[in-house]
Curated annotation (Swiss-Prot):
Lineage, opening ranks: Eukaryota, Metazoa, Chordata, Craniata, Vertebrata
Gene (name only): Plaat5
Name listed for the protein in its UniProt record: Phospholipase A and acyltransferase 5
pH dependence: Optimum pH is 9.0.
Function recorded in the entry: Exhibits both phospholipase A1/2 and acyltransferase activities. Shows phospholipase A1 (PLA1) and A2 (PLA2) activity, catalyzing the calcium-independent release of fatty acids from the sn-1 or sn-2 position of glycerophospholipids. Shows N-acyltransferase activity, catalyzing the calcium-independent transfer of a fatty acyl group at the sn-1 position of phosphatidylcholine (PC) and other glycerophospholipids to the primary amine of phosphatidylethanolamine (PE), forming N-acylphosphatidylethanolamine (NAPE), which serves as precursor for N-acylethanolamines (NAEs).
Keyword Phosphoprotein carried by entry: no
Length: 287
C-alpha cells in the first residue's frame, strides 16, 4: 500500500521541497524552516484494458471495425481441424474453460472377426472342412487320399490335375453312401477329387511308407491308369478301397481299417467267450 494512496487506482501524493515563504497551492501552513513541503498530484497511468482472447463477432463502440474483422480473421485461422494427436489437449483446454467436451467415438469394425463368426451350422461345417483341406499340402502323383465319410473311410490315389482314381459302386446312386461298402463288385473310376469328396473332409495319408517302400512314381501312375474303368471284385474284408490303393502304391494289398475292426472284434469275441465260459463253469460247493 503506497502512503497517502486513497484507493487502488487514485493518484498518489508526491512531495517536493520548496523555499520557505514561497506561496503556492499545496503549501503547508505548519511548515517551518527554510524549506516547506508542497504536495501535488501526478496523473496515475490508466489501468490497461483486459484483452479478451476470444474474439467476438459483435463490434464494440470503443473498438474500430477493422479490429473486429482482424479478430474474425484470427478465428478463421485457428478453426481448422486439429490432428488426432492434438485432440486430447484441445479437449482438456475446453474442459478448463467450462465448455462441453466433444466426444467423437470412432468404431472401426474388424473385418477378420466378422468373417470368422459363422451365422449358421452349415457355415460352421463348411469352414471346418475348408480349414481341414487348406491345412493339407497339395497332393503329388501317387499320394494316397483318405476321405472321412460317415461310418467309414474311403480311399483314393492321386494321379494328376486334381484328379484321383478310386473304387466306386457300379450305380452312381450308391456313390458316397454307406451301402456301397456292401456291394460285391466295384468300378475303377477316374474322377475329380471334389466330386469324390461329396462334402467330406480329407487328408493325404501315406501311413505305410514307414513299413513298405513305395514303388517308383511313374510305375504307380502307369499301374493306376491301366485299371481305369475296369470292374473288379469287391470285398469288405479282403478287397476294399484301401486294399486297392495300397496295392497300387506299395504292391501290397492291405487295409488297416479292416485289421483294426478284426482286432477289436476278436477282443470283443474273446470277452464274450470268457464270460460264457465263466457262466457255465461249475462253482465250488461251499459248506
Amino acid at each position: 500500500m503506497i502512503p497517502g494512496h486513497r484507493g487502488p487506482w487514485s493518484a498518489p501524493l508526491c512531495r517536493r521541497l520548496v523555499p520557505a515563504g514561497h506561496s503556492g497551492m499545496g503549501l503547508s501552513p505548519a511548515a517551518s524552516g527554510e524549506y516547506g513541503i508542497r504536495l501535488f498530484r501526478v496523473p496515475w497511468p490508466s489501468r490497461p484494458k483486459q484483452i479478451s482472447r476470444t474474439a467476438s463477432t459483435e463490434s464494440s463502440d470503443t473498438q474500430p471495425t477493422n479490429d473486429s474483422a482482424s479478430s474474425q480473421a484470427l478465428v478463421v485461422q485457428f478453426l481448422p481441424k486439429l490432428p488426432k494427436q492434438d485432440r486430447g489437449l484441445e479437449q482438456a483446454r475446453s474442459l478448463r474453460q467450462g465448455q462441453k467436451p466433444e466426444i467423437n467415438l470412432e468404431l472401426i469394425p474388424s473385418k477378420k472377426r466378422t468373417e470368422m463368426i459363422p451365422s449358421s451350422d452349415s457355415e460352421i461345417e463348411g469352414n471346418l472342412k475348408n480349414q481341414a483341406a487348406e491345412s493339407n499340402q497339395k497332393p503329388r502323383p501317387g499320394d494316397l487320399i483318405e476321405i472321412f465319410r460317415i461310418g467309414y473311410e474311403h480311399w483314393a490315389i492321386y494321379v494328376e490335375d486334381d484328379c484321383v482314381v478310386h473304387l466306386a459302386p457300379p450305380s452312381e446312386f450308391e456313390a458316397g453312401s454307406i451301402t456301397s461298402i456292401f456291394s460285391n463288385r466295384a468300378v475303377v473310376k477316374y474322377s475329380r477329387l471334389q466330386d469324390v469328396l461329396h462334402g467330406c473332409s480329407w487328408k493325404i495319408n501315406n501311413k505305410l511308407d514307414g513299413t513298405y517302400l513305395p514303388l517308383p512314381v511313374d510305375k504307380i501312375i502307369q499301374r493306376t491308369k491301366n485299371m481305369i474303368n475296369k470292374i473288379v471284385q469287391y470285398s469288405l474284408i479282403e478287397g476294399n478301397c484301401e486294399h486297392f490303393v495300397n496295392d497300387l502304391r506299395y504292391g501290397v494289398p492291405r487295409s488297416q481299417q479292416v485289421e483294426h475292426v478284426l482286432v477289436e472284434g476278436a477282443k470283443a469275441a474273446g470277452a464274450v467267450l470268457s464270460a460264457v465260459v465263466d457262466s457255465i463253469r461249475p462253482k465250488p460247493i461251499t459248506a
